Amino acid sequence: MKRIVHIAALLALCLLASCGTDREHLLKVYNWGDYIDEDLIPEFEQWYEEQTGETVKVVYQTFDINETMLSKIEKGHEDFDVVCPSDYIIQRMLNEGLLLPIDKDFGNTPNYIDANVSPYIKSVFTKIADGGIDANDYSVGYMWGTTGILYNAKYVDPEDARTWDVIRNPKYAGKIFIKDAARDVFCPINIFLHQNQLKAGEVTMDELMMDSSDESLEAFEAFMAQVKPLVAGWEADFGKEQMTQERGWLNFTWSGDAEWAMMEARDLGVDLRYEVPQEGSNVWFDGWVIPKYARNVKAASYFINFLCIPENAIRNMDFIGYVSTVTSAEILEAMSDDELEETVDVRYLFGDIEGADEAHLDPTLYPDASVIERCVMMRDWGEETPKLITTWSRVKGSNANAMTMVVIGLFFAVLLVLGIRKKFFSKRRRRHYRKK
């Protein structure tokens, strides 16, 4: 299917060229699969002409892992105009000089980027780059979330789920699924293993996110050696379905996947809940950037601005199932649910918008300020990254349980192809795989 999509995109380029469409009137977008409401694409083309008096045709292509996208730009010098990497790749591209600044002078068109992107997201983005560069000049946040524990309240004590130590609790042996994402697992566990140093003020959370020391990697590997016999599978995408079917009781996962699973589980009468453990965790972000080899920088900037219109952000959230970095009164109202008894303080995200201090929002998608206080953004390790990847390979090793779950995953894939599980596709609640 990916090959078909790629070929279709190339054919589209050839067809447009044969029809006399100049490159300056094309906008090449490179994004994750299922990561935008594609009805917005033709709407953008019309909106762009209304705003600028110029025509543009979007050529839309998708990738499945960050490294595929990065390689095409870094080594292949492909002329994508706007792409959507994850946080650590944005940092790497900035440090390697692969990004162009985003022009936010839109003339008579409102600057929706500066008006609507969360102040919290902007503050976090200032920490991405080295050398005093403000990443907000080169990137705009798109979606974000946390990493935590999804658990079945029927089998798992909620108190157990409040700590990362739950994944080595023998009570849940054979019922634990862990994301096959080295950085997303290492960083929270490294925080857990350094609790004494954190409490003593000997180290900060930000420092732990950049900790690639041999001592920490060895401690992580030793911890995971105790976890491995309890693990049913290392998963990139199928863990949430195992949770909804009660084949799994614990899932080390992303908030968006957790939300998808909880929605599906409600229909099945399964009580799934999500917790960001008390020791702390990481927040992840994806954002839009303009690569240095782009050939339609103007349309790229307008495209990013278009996606920051609250109505469009709401549509993307509804389609994708993740949380937009765009925050406004309209979004707060649209995402509120008065049936939720507990409220969350999301002033860190929405600023001084009325009602943000006691908002009736889903805490899985919109964590309370008290949760965010113990979360930090992951950073790129640069040349140290291979050390983590090597450690992670040893952690997983060869595992009969993991292989069993791969077989189960393939079985469900066949069912999907046959259309037996169309329900899961209809909601599009899937998170792309953030390879670390």
Indicate residue ranges for each PLM-predicted region.
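Mature extracytoplasmic/periplasmic domains
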Residues: 291-371, 432
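Periplasmic-binding protein-like
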Residues: 110-112, 218-226, 268-292
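Ligand-binding pocket segment of bilobal, Venus flytrap-like solute-binding proteins
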Residues: 175-178, 185, 189, 198-273
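C-terminal motif of bacterial Sec signal peptides marking the signal peptidase cleavage site
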Residues: 15-18
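Ligand-binding "clamshell"
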Residues: 94-102, 134-136, 261-276, 338-343
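Conserved C-terminal helix/tail region of periplasmic/extracytoplasmic solute-binding proteins
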Residues: 357-436
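Early extracytoplasmic/lumenal segment of secretory-pathway proteins
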Residues: 20-96, 397-405
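Hinge/lid segment of periplasmic solute-binding proteins
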Residues: 61, 67-70, 87, 91-144, ...
